[in-house]
């Protein structure tokens, strides 16, 4: 794999190739004389960019001079013999060596060429620049973050770039798998904006806030109604978060509170009744927490079965007992002469970590050649233009968002996905509003699936599942650790049914370690990994009665966890096809979070231990009020030059040399005054007008979009990101994504409607297992299986 990222253009491109390097790819980074400019991007540790050091581990580096004819020939020779080329920016780094990324794909038929830009290579906003905060604004994530009124709160910097990188890695590995199938590579015009819209907090995917986009008959443009759905309380040494959902969890909390007489009525077993009375219950919980430490509260809550976790600070995460025990953190010489704790990576394969092995190389450390000849591959068996996963069969035991997204990604690309469901414990995404037969979330997440109703606790049900495993390629599950084994389907058992099977799983804190048995709700994962603590803003401070955190309405990291799982599962299937052996792969949601924000965690840990000098990022990203009712835009000032250009747009060039704002450190120190000065300009313009004027001057800015705005975004329309999906049980068409990225040789996702529970049970058992009508009828009558009425 040829990595042409400069570490600056299209932020996060280095992460794409790091992901594939972790999985064993030979990644050769091509740098110009003097090295990539990304080596100096802040924050820096002992003079080296932390982000560059983290995202270029496990790679090699060769220096080629684009002005030297012999080096230009060497570059083309490398591209000709590569499997994948990853480039970034417009026109891209490859163009300096004589051929753009698209031209390389034209020239070398086998090559998969990925071009990553902020907004895509063409379209009305292709020249726009993006930062993470700009992507939060334009993707709709910002509109769901912050108080009900007042300034919206930016999510932590880094999540958007890391999410886009995972989506890009998935897209390029899909194209590579397709090359193995049909013999032809591809060119992918990848937009980070597209990726963040689809994979961070998608407005048109499994998400509780989707009502803003499709349920209302009007154009609802409100803000979050409840930022305390998962309440946080101060305690003696910090904060704790509760996530009380099930009746048994409420009863545990009630015991902890001393069985208060006012709340003994069984009606409080229902969430709605508790929410109505929560102001009164909250007084008791606050009193309980006030005099105890985080550790004491978490231990007591766990003993009573109450979902609770500490709201930890980033500086404490890398040293936590859990991450240390499972090897998610390793002590490494991240930069020359400096050792510090670093996240190992996302992936666990057959119980072993596939992650950080070697530090980022020095520029030109290696020769411009590949380590080995390409691995032999069998002759192509598929046709160009087909779906890459045609012929793959997936048994999907996944639930809610992370599990559903994993299987959807395969179904959208042609796999036969069989969703195996229990009559007694249906998938939470099947919950609907009164009178509805199908939820929008289920329709989006389980399109292109078949539905099998099967009791896996019944001996006959187990036998049927085992027979299906023998006929399948992969099993996907995201149960609490130990659940699949308790059902009788450990990986060893599945492997005995089918030695080629891939088991891909995910859980909140992984399947081993001190926290592995903790309850795995997303809000608890965010709190335990430091995300909640940094999801805050000086511009949106609450009154003294409320904590300052605003992550309650995000669904991060569920959607990106599904994509990380898909990437790992596909890598395991590629390895299976080469070696004949299956694999057990697993993803920890908490470790996904830590690796998404690795630069922040490493900087905070290094600062806490004072291992070397750290220079922070001095960019100023802020949310500004615009003309209209609750309208906002985001502006990013990353350099003195950008500030000068911005002041010209504001019509106040004298601010460029104002001692409060003229230098980066001064802008950080005088942030509130800068925000006030810029707000005077933005408040007289619409968000699109303000962003457009700044983008024309080369300054990253973007309007805060709501879901309805996203459907009208001219760049997304130009790129055909969505098309209407019709489900016979839903009154109106739903906007649905068309695929992970625009490919040349892979068609858009099909749109077969999501099934009702057990809808395809009979068909599956007859077609795959050769059962007769009498057999399937008996199994349904005996409640081993459920489904529609049997017909001969």
Swiss-Prot record:
The keyword Endoplasmic reticulum does not apply. GO terms for molecular function: transferase activity. InterPro entries: CoA-transferase_III (IPR050509), CoA-Trfase_fam_III (IPR003673), CoA-Trfase_III_dom3_sf (IPR044855), CoA-Trfase_III_dom_1_sf (IPR023606). One of its GO terms (cellular component) is peptidoglycan-based cell wall. Keywords: Transferase. This is Probable CoA-transferase Rv1866. It comes from the Bacteria. Pfam families: CoA_transf_3. Probable CoA-transferase. SUPFAM superfamilies: CoA-transferase family III (CaiB/BaiF). It comes from Mycobacterium tuberculosis (strain ATCC 25618 / H37Rv). The active site is at 558 (nucleophile). Belongs to the CoA-transferase III family. Its EC number is 2.8.3.-.
